[in-house]
Amino acid sequence: MGQLFSFFEEVPNIIHEAINIALIAVSLIAALKGMINLWKSGLFQLIFFLTLAGRSCSFRIGRSTELQNITFDMLKVFEDHPTSCMVNHSTYYVHENKNATWCLEVSVTDVTLLMAEHDRQVLNNLSNCVHPAVEHRSRMVGLLEWIFRALKYDFNHDPTPLCQKQTSTVNETRVQINITEGFGSHGFEDTILQRLGVLFGSRIAFSNIQDLGKKRFLLIRNSTWKNQCEMNHVNSMHLMLANAGRSSGSRRPLGIFSWTITDAVGNDMPGGYCLERWMLVTSDLKCFGNTALAKCNLDHDSEFCDMLKLFEFNKKAIETLNDNTKNKVNLLTHSINALISDNLLMKNRLKELLNTPYCNYTKFWYVNHTASGEHSLPRCWLVRNNSYLNESEFRNDWIIESDHLLSEMLNKEYIDRQGKTPLTLVDICFWSTLFFTTTLFLHLVGFPTHRHIRGEPCPLPHRLNSRGGCRCGKYPELKKPITWHKNH
């Protein structure tokens, strides 16, 4: 009953909107009929012919949709990250960031610069390879570690690298790896060249390696950045994603002259501590942290102290467990995201190798509805042979995206219209339509209303029996044939 009252309160608004819908429907029907007549008359065909004859026709979908795109300058995004580029298909340069004046040069050569008899071997510690007098030493060591991790270098099984011997006169950073076939390096040359191609994104890298000697080395050394080549943001993404799963734990510095109980990473264990200062005849006790527990640590003969320690330890242990669990989950999430991103980049690299269109995550296209301002989700503008595809090469994708956009807009509009119609009005419309259909069927079938003497006028208001006589007995039975009639 309350729903019915609410419906009657909204009747003026419903009638007003229904009238508008009816007017729009009549207008659309009239306009559509007029357009059909004009189309059948051939007027539109003549105008189109005179307008388009001798001119090029651009392809459009609908009246309010057009193809638009957006381009990102990814080098601006990676200004503070390491970027790389290639020179002459044989030398790579890794630039630390936009403002750095130095870089690392990665190349393959047959010239022996370092000897195992004179230079030091690297045993999983690249910091010994950088001279202490080199400016930005810590950042250079970090970039070296990034490159080795990106190449998936195993210090235990792969050939041992050699570092430049540090002297007072030579402060150049050089790291040399023997990649030729030999003891401990079987198949390493093909593996490291393939990893370099994947990391720096070039299938034609080191194409002249066959011209070198039988003994070849991978050489990494520092150099001055002089804009030797143009940076590629895709290589920067490869370098960062290869190091995405890297995490390092740090230990915070503790007080030098303090006595406390800590775990492996420097976090305070549950409880407190006390310092006792002795004088000639007396002593002074000063407690820190949890004072009650600290005094219990000093004198733990009471059961209350044992229970207090247990409660405090359990509380701190649960907090430590929660923190460690959150850190592990975050690390796992970052690693999975890095693997997914690296998988996408590898798919694009395979597409480049097969000479098929691929995405370089720079330019994106989308369909914009200029009338409503709505647009589809951006999609990557594919690249083939270092150039973006022509619009005609993915016109089918554009058409499908436009259809999806229009369908989504129509569906949203339909849901909005459905929300403005009260449920009571729908029920009344349904039952009234059902009632109208039922009465229409009954009207078409019809029911006989009275008897009629065949061939004579209607005897109303008298009712006849089966023998043609009046039921009231006023008139005698005529014994004439009768029939049923619906109308008078």
UniProtKB/Swiss-Prot annotation:
Extracellular side: 2-17, 54-58, 59-427
Site (Important for GP-C-mediated membrane fusion): 33
Family matches, as InterPro entries: Arena_glycoprot, Arena_glycoprot_zinc-bd
Annotated binding of Zn(2+) 1, by residue: 57, 462, 470, 472
Annotated Gene3D superfamilies: 6.10.140.1590, Arenavirus glycoprotein, zinc binding domain
A Pfam cross-reference name: Arena_glycoprot
Family according to the record: Belongs to the arenaviridae GPC protein family.
HAMAP family noted in UniProt: ARENA_GPC
Protein name (Swiss-Prot/TrEMBL): Pre-glycoprotein polyprotein GP complex
Originating species: Sabia mammarenavirus (isolate Human/Brasil/SPH114202/1990)
Lineage start: Viruses, Riboviria, Orthornavirae, Negarnaviricota, Polyploviricotina
